[in-house]
Amino acid sequence: NYMITILQARTRGMTLMRMPLTVWGIFTATVLAMLAFPALLVSAIMMTLDKVLQTSFFMPTILKAGEVLEYGGGSPILFQHLFWFFGHPEVYIVALPAFGIVSDLISVHARKNIFGYRMMVWAIVGIGGLSFFVWAHHMYVSGMNPWFGFFFATTTLIIAVPTAMKVYNWILTLWRGNIRINTVMLWCLGFIVTFVNGGITGIFLGNVSVDVPLSDTYFVIAHFHMVMGIAPLMVIMGAVYHWFPLVAGKMLHEGLGKWHFWITFLGAYSIYFPMHYLGFIGCLLYTSDA
């Protein structure tokens, strides 16, 4: 519905290169969902067959009454590939609409056209396309061939280029704009700061030699929650404060909105930012109680 509406039901004169960036983000995320979710569906079906019919897609061996049965060919690594082929585009299914929304909010509340509109569009499309070539950076410690690790580390760093372009364009849109530091703008600025912090930690985890000692530590928890938790939440709240008056015909309280932002921002950083240090000193996510 999203794809056909955007492609076929635009108003007269609304060309693709005139659409709001929010719509571009939703459109690209919809394409990613159409291509990525089948991998998750297939892996779920294969896992169900392994459990119910004792097939061997993911299970290399099976025990029955303490006896190893003839059961071969399965690989748990195959499940990881299928899951993460869905899992990493899913990050951008969440992030790309947020990128579009924050671009439009910054433009409105800086009272200035978004800097480099076409560049922003192609950055959204480029991020979406590259998201299908980076999934195995979640699997550096799975025993993959080092050349594959090198390939996925390279693509992971490449996808940072269009992402950085978007951040630069947001900053250049703010530059010399007639900025109103209201609640919506605070949420947008909080998103930029949080997303940049999360992106920097992502560079650590995208590098094979650094990721191996940091894998399964609290550093990963901090990175994930900054990028996939706090940053999108800030965009959602900014969008609510921006569009609620249009929907309800009432303005939300500006003073309470700023309190809401600062409690959320400082609270999130007080919880997740120290986890980077915990990861660096080797605090693991999982510890055996045996």
What residue spans do the PLM features occupy?
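Short amphipathic alpha-helical coupling elements at transmembrane boundaries
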Residues: 5-11, 173-176
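Conserved small/polar residues in nucleotide/adenosyl-binding loops
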Residues: 286-290
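Hydrophobic cores of alpha-helical transmembrane segments in multi-pass integral membrane proteins
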Residues: 1-5, 22-73, 79-108, 117-140, ...
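Generic hydrophobic alpha-helical segments
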Residues: 13-15, 178, 273
